[in-house]
């Protein structure tokens, strides 16, 4: 799955893990489709890179709602977890690396007050982000929500590769990526930073998410972040599978 350059860098980065993590895969029963095979192959390849990483297929109630998918969780604390439905390759490879490191105990670069704000969020929040491997605006959103899921057991986040779940894309009316839902309702679309997501969450919950001051007041205007063309949501149709991750992107997670 990974070329030699990416594999070498990932192996080095996994040396930053502080605690055991587990990759829990959910695939179709026969696992004959290409993405299921690639999911199992990717998780097995990662597990071979560190003694602190193991992988196994989910059973019974452990199985995710979508297949193929895999859940990254702390071995001793399964409440610290994120899920990828599909393959986080292309532009999302850095999101995969950060998820592995953060769940493995490597500290986030987020400000201390932001981390405390996330940990103090109340209520149950089930986020889903629809992405494509070639989307340049998706990683910021995926990584922000992954961090929130890692830090707060009341928050769950699944990143969904839209091209693999076209029926769901059609049913939900997703027209562009990234699109984020919260508890089954549309939450936002377009590129957003962590601070914007926290402010938006505080806005839609009427302040019950706690600590909006740390992220600043909610932004006025629509949920889609205005900005240069490359910050606008990207259409779902016509997206290719994307190129492999740029190795220089990995510098951001060290």
Name these PLM-found stretches.
Residues 4-44, 119-153:
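Local sequence-structure signature of Cys/Sec-based thiol-disulfide redox active-site neighborhoods
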Residues 224-254:
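Long, low-complexity, intrinsically disordered segments
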Residues 1-20, 92-122, 209-219:
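N-terminal leader/targeting and pre-domain segments
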Residues 30, 87, 132-135, 163, ...:
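Short, surface-exposed acidic/glycine-rich loop or hinge patches that mediate macromolecular interfaces
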Residues 72-107, 176, 181-226, 230:
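Non-catalytic, surface beta->alpha helical segment in thiol-disulfide oxidoreductase systems
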Residues 154-204, 245-254:
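C-terminal, charge/polar-rich interaction regions
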